[in-house]
Regions:
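Structured helix-beta-strand junction loops
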Residues: 8, 129-130, 176
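C-terminal regulatory/interaction regions
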Residues: 155-185
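Active-site HxH/HxHxD metal-binding segment of metal-dependent hydrolases
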Residues: 1-54, 153-154, 161-162
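Intrinsic structural disorder
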Residues: 11-12, 85-87, 185
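Metallo-beta-lactamase
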Residues: 43-46, 54-56, 61-165
């Protein structure tokens, strides 16, 4: 579908250089064959991002940080947004799932078991970033829907703004993953 988006909308396709390397060198790891979506195909990116590169879209600058673990090319993103004259720092951790880090899965995919330590290192790499608003990979990861419902019930509140949530999120994910590994997964 990426190529179709580029054709329809004239957008640029962007991915980390590490992710692009995986698509070129190990396309089977992209898991497109398992997708029922007929548009799930490999694509050629227009831009391959390096760790720490800043991508500017309009008046928003996004710091792109390589945080491998879930996959070798995962990136996390950090940018600022404004509301009512205040600036908030937004953070998005690129790959919070463990499903690719089971010992058997890594061995079957011929990926190093050190990907598990790499995941933990990636979490620590971004833990101290100043983040006021956390965007989760999936709504359940940071109670996105409940926060939105609260905003509707209590106009004028914004539960998305929580300067402590980022470190809690990283610490909880770190603890959960350590338990996952201690359980022999």
């Amino acid at each position: 579908a990426a190529d179709e988006f580029r054709d329809l909308y004239g957008c640029k396709l962007v991915i980390s250089r590490a992710g692009a390397d995986v698509m070129r060198e190990r396309p089977e790891l992209v898991y497109l064959k398992a997708s029922p979506n007929p548009y799930a195909t490999l694509f050629t990116p227009d831009l391959e991002l390096e760790d720490g590169q800043v991508l500017t879209l309009g008046n928003t600058s996004i710091r792109c940080v390589l945080t491998p673990g879930h996959s070798p090319g995962v990136m996390s993103f950090f940018f600022d947004t404004c509301e009512d004259g205040r600036t908030y720092h937004v953070g998005y951790f690129g790959g919070a799932g463990f499903n690719t880090l089971y010992r058997e899965k890594l061995l079957a995919d011929k990926l190093p078991l050190t990907m598990r330590e790499t995941f933990l290192e990636s979490l620590q790499k971004v833990r101290e970033y100043p983040v006021d608003v956390v965007l989760g990979n999936h709504p359940r990861q940071n109670e996105t829907l409940a926060k939105r419902e609260q905003m509707l019930r209590q106009p004028g509140t914004n539960p998305f703004v929580d300067p402590g949530e980022w470190k809690r999120f990283v610490d909880e994910l770190t603890g959960q993953f350590k338990e996952f590994m201690e359980a022999g997964n």
